[in-house]
């Protein structure tokens, strides 16, 4: 029987999920995206060639792997069609390998306009969204006014009525509250009619396909976007995304019940990063634009190429935080960890790990909001670094002694086994200690 494996991020996103999903799909029959939208950026490097995906599952480069977009994803037809075109130019038969749930809510031009107008109005208090309409699209989903893929495929008067109702509200907000131009109904309808021709042949009952595969004993990979600390419920609210990025989102976003999930792999950087606003207790402040700030922060950002795959924004960098990782392990019921970018720490004289916090407000214990995080002072444990290169190593026996000690200490602190170690961006630059599909 094939196993069903979940791959998700345990930090604030950008942990290296795309590479690992791509690597592990050699044993999968299908790969599923179950939440988020095109705010994700998953980078794959195969044979030295770089591919960045935002919506399409990372298994798309594999032959004989079905790629599915589940109902929990908010789907931008414009972004998807653009991404399909780029891949098709590279010879990837996307239309043969990709299928979409009819229940995905659509991201339309009015959602993007709202998202960007809100961020602008917030000024210095902005959340740091990608401005791509993700949040407003999820709002419409919860408010039961979303236009979904099924509506797009049906077209006709029913689609027009839904668009009119949505735009009436959104345009009132845009013009009367935010003071920007309205989005024209005719323009949105014309786009929908264009998109229908491309997307209609790809629509399928994703949940049924998943259960058919399960009954046939085929292995399935569930690919998460963003990271657990950006979860709408468990993240540093309000500096979060609008979906459930933790393991619970798999079932609601795909229709695969939790008892059918066999293994949950948490992708975790060997240090910590965050892009955009929000609290970050172990941050080492560095500004790439002016080349000023903490030297270690500069090292992590420069050597780790810490710029967002979706936005190009500089990622904030800091020491590994074992305290927040313990919470991710628990919330996601992780089976194992994949530790990425260990090679970025090469050459550092010493390395710190946050093992706890000072002055935790017991009255807010368990709260994951931004206010609770802002006052936290990390308690660090210092470990010796290593001068040897770990780039491209494929066996744990090859690791320098201090690097191995660092890996083992993380395992002890987070109480979860490290099953995979990534030592570079390419598929081949990986140590697989325990394969999720055979665990």
Swiss-Prot record:
GTP binds at residues 13-19, 41-43, 315, 341-343, 422-424. Substrate binds at residues 309-315. Pathway: Purine metabolism; AMP biosynthesis via de novo pathway; AMP from IMP: step 1/2. GO terms for cellular component: cytoplasm. Mg(2+) binds at residues 14, 41. Binds 1 Mg(2+) ion per subunit. Its EC number is 6.3.4.4. It holds the Pfam family Adenylsucc_synt. The keyword Magnesium applies. IMP binds at residues 14-17, 39-42, 130, 144, 226, 241, 313. Belongs to the adenylosuccinate synthetase family. This is Adenylosuccinate synthetase.
